[in-house]
Every structure is written in C-alpha cells, then in structure tokens.
Amino acid sequence: MSTKHALLSASSASRWLHCPPSARLGENYEDKPSEYAAEGTEAHALGEYKILKSLKRRAVNPAKKLKYFSEEMDECTDGYKDMVLELVMSAGATCDDPQVLIEQRVDFSKWVQEGFGTADALIVTDGNLTICDYKHGKGVA
C-alpha cells in the first residue's frame, strides 16, 4: 500500500469540503500513523485476501504477519467479504461479466486536482459502478 496521500483525498473529503483550508494546513505536519490506522491497514489486507480467495484469484494469506490480528478483525473482514460477494452476485444478475477490482489504485484528477487514492472494492457492470469503502477501527489517536 502506498504511503503517499492525495491533497484532496476521498477519505478526507468530509473535512476539506467543510473547511477547504484544512487540506493545505495538513501539509505542515508530519503524517504519523496511529496504531488504529495500522490496525485498519492490516484489516484491509486481510479483507483483500479473503475476497480474492473467494473469487478464486491468487492471493497470499497475510494473517501470520499481522501484528493486530484478532478474532474481531477476522469476523469483521468476513462481514466485509460477504457484503462484497453479495454485491458481485447481484451485479452478475444484470451483467454477464462484472469486473471486480480489490484495493485498486484510482486516479480522479479529472475531477479533483491531483486526486488519487485506493478504492477498497470496485464492481463495474454495464453502465454501473459500485464503490465499497471498508471502515475498520476503534478510534482516533
């Protein structure tokens, strides 16, 4: 996962849409990820693995390398996987070949200057795009 963050990232849009100067103000501070953020990053990796395996794609199980792995993380990522697979099945009802992209780097700079990020899950069908945003965490440090 990339550590570079977009100035106007989708994940912080609520903040910069309500307070536009906050985007540039944040550049003056070092980006120190909290333990909560590290746990969320690991949960995304586990969720990605579970979805890819369920879609019969190659993936390496990250569980042994996860510092914050817990039964709760396991259950939460199962729920995330199940939701994405349900959406994929629904998409298959209206499209012969839905495209499923997991942890996909996206560039939306056409609409937001220097806009880019990583989409947790994208499901593309004929004339439709479903974007899944997995949230995992307990707090802000």
Give each language-model segment a name:
Residues 1-124, 128-129:
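Metal-dependent nuclease catalytic cores that hydrolyze phosphodiester bonds in DNA/RNA
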Residues 134-141:
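Short beta-strand-loop-alpha-helix junction that forms the active-site gateway
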